[in-house]
A protein has these predicted regions:
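Switch/communication elements of ASCE P-loop NTPase nucleotide-binding domains
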Residues: 1-61, 236-378
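Extended helical coiled-coil dimerization/tether regions that scaffold
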Residues: 170-284
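A structural signal for short, well-ordered beta-strand segments and their strand-loop junctions
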Residues: 140-143, 225-230, 236, 321, ...
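Solvent-exposed, amphipathic alpha-helical segments
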Residues: 50, 184-191, 271, 382-392
């Protein structure tokens, strides 16, 4: 299951000029860029709304609905006629559309997600009939609040039994429900202990739990052996120090970056194992995962690697992420399609895959981020003064003296690239490619 196209009209800051993204089928990662207020989260919410009818066909799974506040209000303060989300999905070569609306000043047309709905119903009926080899796709949405979670203090209220489709519970809610994962992991550890006793094999490990452990082990390399202890109730892992010794830590004791990644990866792997427990490797489950601000609380070194890590651990998932970080773009250069929402409706193509993005400075100075220079803003006035003097038709003695002073002060900046140089380089590369010339 993957998203192939999404278009949005009259949603929040997106007005009557439809915003449409056609997704490259050769890429498993879509990176959304844009200034604050240009609709990165809006696009993610729209995708969540479009795909929600699929999990909503299963028992106990709520639909994901937008509110009246999501309908666009124009500059005159008038609400639009209605909000429209139009998406196209594909699953094993079968194309499915999902068109959803939200009422504004007029009644909406009838929504159309029958293909998506029927595909889900067919899966549900096959599971109930206990047919074999039925794979449930995964849908998940991790918002910016995913770092604010609480570990339950007691086992009270834990779910005792899990159906395969329970993998969809709270999945499209952008707030991470760590308690749900906690309850599932606790139950599976109990089952693993009972299976060890039944099999008379103290080395036995649950394949389902191993999927979660393996996912965490690959992405969070310095931490191993995730487990739940009951007195007091806590989720802990062992940190491997540089000297090889182990140090037990509760998840609450970890940095925000580690907490966010561990909670997200554990939740995602658990949902995959829950959805497809009979798969040889549940981490090969297909599906769509949305992550808002994927760089949240991550050190630049980890930002550079996180997309590669996620696609290696979950090879059949489609990740659609937003970011403000050029390091994320550099790290995902080979595997991701990059869409700049600032220019998506411009004549120029906003899909920047043909741009050579070999370093962070180049990305910052490209049209993806729009910085003019990499130096501190404190130099702007001096550069402006120099440019003003140079623009004069004739220079006085005082002008030449001041230019010499400015050149001395600015000489350390002359080696830094600027946006014009980057654009010139990109244009040369583009022309060379068109003319089949090797540079």
């Amino acid at each position: 299951m993957r998203l192939d196209r999404i278009s949005i009209t009259n949603m929040r800051l997106v007005g009557e000029d439809t915003r449409e993204i056609n997704i490259n089928p050769a890429k498993n990662v879509l990176i959304l860029l844009g200034d604050n207020g240009f609709g990165k989260t809006t696009v993610l919410d729209a995708i969540a709304t479009a795909m929600a009818p699929y999990p909503a066909q299963f028992p106990g799974i709520a639909d994901y609905q937008l509110s009246d506040l999501d309908v666009h209000i124009n500059r005159r303060g008038r609400r639009s006629k209605y909000l429209t989300i139009d998406a196209e999905f594909s699953d094993n070569g079968v194309s499915m559309t999902s068109v959803r609306y939200r009422k504004g000043t007029l009644n909406t047309p009838k929504p159309n997600y029958e293909q998506l709905k029927q595909a889900a119903i067919a899966k549900k009926e096959a599971i109930i009939a206990e047919e074999s080899n039925i794979e449930l796709p995964i849908f998940a949405y991790y918002g910016t609040g995913r770092g604010q979670f609480q570990v339950p203090e007691r086992r009270r209220g834990f779910q005792q039994t899990f159906e395969r489709w329970d993998c969809y519970k709270s999945a499209i809610n952008p707030e991470t429900d760590f308690k749900r994962f906690f309850g599932w992991f606790d139950m599976m550890e109990d089952q693993e202990r009972r299976d060890r006793e039944r099999l008379w094999d103290i080395t036995y490990k649950s394949p389902v739990l191993q999927a979660v452990r393996n996912a965490l082990g690959i992405i969070v390399k310095d931490y191993i052996n995730p487990r739940i202890e009951t007195r007091p109730l806590r989720f802990i892992m062992d940190r491997i120090d540089k000297d090889g010794s182990r140090h037990e830590l509760r998840i609450e004791q970890l940095s925000e970056g580690y907490k966010i990644v561990i909670a997200m990866v554990a939740d995602l792997a658990a949902r995959m194992a829950e959805a497809n427990p009979e798969m040889e490797n549940p981490l090969n489950t297909s599906g769509i995962v949305l992550i808002d601000e994927v760089d949240l609380h991550l050190h630049p070194r980890w930002q550079r690697e996180i997309l590669i890590q996620l696609t290696e651990v979950f090879p059949n998932l489609q990740f659609i992420v937003s970011t403000h970080s050029p390091v994320i773009v550099v790290g995902g250069a080979e595997i991701a399609q990059v869409v700049n929402l600032n220019t998506i409706n411009d004549d120029e193509n906003s899909h920047q895959n043909d741009i050579q993005i070999s370093n962070v400075g180049q990305v910052l100075l490209s049209d993806l981020f729009g910085l003019e220079y990499l130096y501190s803003p404190e130099w702007d006035d001096k550069i402006q003064e120099r440019d003003t003097i140079l623009a004069k038709p004739e220079l006085t003695v005082e002008d030449n003296t001041r230019l010499a002073e400015l050149d001395e002060e600015l000489k350390g900046l002359t080696s830094l690239p600027n946006s014009n140089a980057i654009r010139s380089s990109q244009l040369i590369e583009k022309l060379a490619k068109q003319l089949n010339i090797e540079l």
